[in-house]
Amino acid sequence: MIIVGIDAKNGEVATEGWKFNSKLDAIALSKKFEDYGVAEIVYTDIEKDGMMKGINIEATVNLANEIEIPVIASGGVSNIEDIKKISAHETDGISGVIIGRALYEEKIKIQEAQEFLNKNYVGN
């Protein structure tokens, strides 16, 4: 199984460690990867990543609605509420969420997040 990561800002793919905006549309690139048989997309909104200011739910769900393959949300998770909000979009094609800094800084307990997901969502 191949899962591809797309890092984007304002809907455009960022490259070379987020230094450059490629002007390539994230949705268009996702559709190409879908055509190539990629299993899932990890979508990171780089304006949110590491900032712990919440996931860009609108952009992530918009991408998920435009393609058939599942999308894993990444960037900005700050607390359990962010996980609850993005998980509510499971039927839109959101298959998971990546948590980084919020775990390292103990803003989220992995057990609490997993228990919530196990009780509330089909994919778990």
Regions found by a protein language model. Name each.
Residues 1-49:
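Conserved anion-binding
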Residues 106-124:
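Short, basic/aromatic-enriched C-terminal tail that caps enzymatic domains
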Residues 46-48, 75-79, 90-112:
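Glycine-rich phosphate-binding active-site loops on the catalytic face of alpha/beta enzymes
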Residues 2-12, 70-77, 98-102:
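Short, basic, helix/turn surface patches
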Residues 58-93, 113:
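Catalytic cores of alpha/beta
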Residues 1-2, 37-39, 66-70, 88-96, ...:
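Glycine-enriched alpha-helix->loop->beta-strand junction motifs that scaffold or abut catalytic
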Residues 23-27, 57, 80, 107:
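Structural motif corresponding to alpha-helix initiation and N-cap regions
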Residues 14-17, 52-55, 83-85, 108-110:
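Short, well-ordered secondary-structure micro-motifs
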